[in-house]
């Protein structure tokens, strides 16, 4: 279960880092947004290495589902746009898939 905590923290750091660049490059905010963006993206990379997985690719694949879910929470609470029901359905499918990837090796032993 600790893996999910690392995934969630990493996801919000990645989204925040990318959003900082979005603020600068797409919304015309100050280039100083790059600094917290780089810090956040570095923290994202460090957090993702905390996940217990035999292979990096498997950890990244499982992380993808959590990232999709975190993105919708970001959409709702930071950008203040209401996700559609189909967005939540997609998230549910992604999280189920991520769980299969993460726990699959334990089930196949």
Curated annotation (Swiss-Prot):
The keyword Transport does not apply. It is a multi-pass membrane protein. One of its GO terms (cellular component) is plasma membrane. Its main location: membrane. It is found in: Cell inner membrane. The chain crosses the membrane at residues 5-25, 27-47, 59-79, 84-104. InterPro entries: UPF0060. Pfam families: UPF0060 (PF02694). Signal peptide: none annotated. It comes from the Bacteria. Keywords: Cell inner membrane, Cell membrane, Membrane, Transmembrane, Transmembrane helix. Belongs to the UPF0060 family. This is UPF0060 membrane protein PA14_21660.
């Amino acid at each position: 279960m600790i893996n999910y905590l690392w995934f969630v923290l990493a996801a919000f750091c990645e989204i925040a880092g990318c959003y900082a660049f979005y603020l600068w490059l797409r919304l015309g905010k100050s280039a100083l947004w790059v600094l917290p963006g780089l810090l956040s993206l570095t923290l994202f990379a460090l957090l993702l290495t905390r996940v217990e997985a035999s292979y990096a690719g498997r950890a990244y694949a499982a992380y993808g589902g959590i990232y999709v879910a975190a993105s919708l929470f970001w959409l709702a609470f930071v950008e203040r746009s209401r996700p559609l029901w189909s967005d939540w359905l997609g998230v549910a499918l992604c999280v189920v898939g991520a769980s299969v990837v993460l726990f699959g090796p334990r089930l196949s032993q």
